[in-house]
Swiss-Prot record:
Domain of life from the UniProt record: Archaea
SMART domains associated with the record: NAC (SM01407)
HAMAP family in alphabetical order: NAC_arch
Function noted in UniProt: Contacts the emerging nascent chain on the ribosome.
Domain NAC-A/B, chain residue ranges per copy: 1-68
Listed GO MF terms: RNA binding
Protein family: Belongs to the NAC-alpha family.
Name used for this protein in its record: Nascent polypeptide-associated complex protein
Assembly mode: Homodimer. Interacts with the ribosome. Binds ribosomal RNA.
Length: 108
């Protein structure tokens, strides 16, 4: 069977296939690690009201870092120093988890 016949048969069965050419990366968020597919080639297949995605690419796994600072400390540093969450966490790391020192480091 050639690809043209396959597409025609799929159309007769009500199956629609769409290449998602603008997708470059796919990330699946797991409990302990993330699965990242780079150089992704994604095809969406629609059949019987359901959408299924076929993903091809280069898989890499990234373990999640256990957050060691309380949400309250992070928010306090963010609000007082007027910085992003990432900057607040970096400042807390540099200040050994001490919010007051993190704020002083960011504002002075």
């Amino acid at each position: 069977m050639n690809p043209r016949e396959i597409r025609r048969m799929m159309a007769q069965m009500g199956i629609k296939s769409t290449e998602m050419s603008d997708v470059k990366q796919v990330i699946f968020k797991g409990k302990d690690k993330d699965y990242i597919i780079d150089n992704a080639s994604v095809t969406m297949i629609e059949a019987q009201g359901q959408k299924t995605f076929q993903v091809l690419g280069n898989l890499r796994e990234v373990k999640k870092e256990v957050e060691q600072y309380s949400e309250d400390d992070i928010k306090l540093v963010m609000e007082q120093a007027k910085v992003t969450r990432e900057k607040a966490i970096e400042a807390l790391k540099a200040a050994n988890g001490e919010p007051a020192q993190a704020i002083l480091n960011l504002t002075s």
